[in-house]
Amino acid sequence: MKIDVLTLFPEMFQSPFEESIFKRATDNNLVRLEIYNFRDFAHDKHHAVDDSPYGGGAGMLLKPEPLFEAVEDVLREDPTPAPIILLSPQGRSFNQEVARELAKHERLIIICGHYEGFDERVREHLATDEISIGDFVLTGGELAAMVVIDAVSRLIPGVLGSGESSQDDSHSNGLLEHPHYTRPPVFRGWGIPDVLLSGNHAQINRWRRKESLRRTLKRRPDMFEKIPLSKTDRKLVDEILAEENAQG
């Protein structure tokens, strides 16, 4: 996958993507990240990319010309089709389902906002998608872009090195992940569930599924309501509810 990012702060993307899993992905040509400073497409002597809003009001808006020219230049350089994603608090909510959707594309173009927002013509006539990572305010779209890039890249075959890794992540199947334990088996008097030491993989898988259901039910009931439960899942949920009731 190729990911083109348009930003006013290209330096912000250097360190996070030169480490760990993403670096291995780029070294293995699984992901290619290209960063563009759209200030380079502002042609006045001050290279201004923002201006005050018509009608008055606080803050400055990003002008349409530099962004349109930047995207057009990127597409001239490589005409591979791509969704043009605007990162904005007005966009659709980003989640694992959206990450899976984006991971199917051969290429993404991501626009990072700044200041008070965009001239509306960017939203209406340039962007093909608009995404928000949450109901809070950030200084710019760069951190949001990093979140999207990281979540999407993990889903590209070969990036994690194991097909099971991304499938087992929290949210990947609609459930929060089950608890994990490693050595030592007892730490400061705290042990681990006996089933994990049993060697019985069927029982271990059952325990993991049950604890995934339990954790999602308790911590994210909004997610739990959307999960299609099998007969086995329903039986496990009945056990969970009985155990919770017994504990008071």
Swiss-Prot record:
S-adenosyl-L-methionine binds at residues 113, 133-138. This is tRNA (guanine-N(1)-)-methyltransferase. GO terms for molecular function: tRNA (guanine(37)-N1)-methyltransferase activity. GO terms for cellular component: cytosol. Its main location: cytoplasm. Keywords: Cytoplasm, Methyltransferase, S-adenosyl-L-methionine, Transferase, tRNA processing. The keyword Cytoplasm applies. Belongs to the RNA methyltransferase TrmD family. It is found in: Cytoplasm. It catalyses: guanosine(37) in tRNA + S-adenosyl-L-methionine = N(1)-methylguanosine(37) in tRNA + S-adenosyl-L-homocysteine + H(+). It comes from the Bacteria.
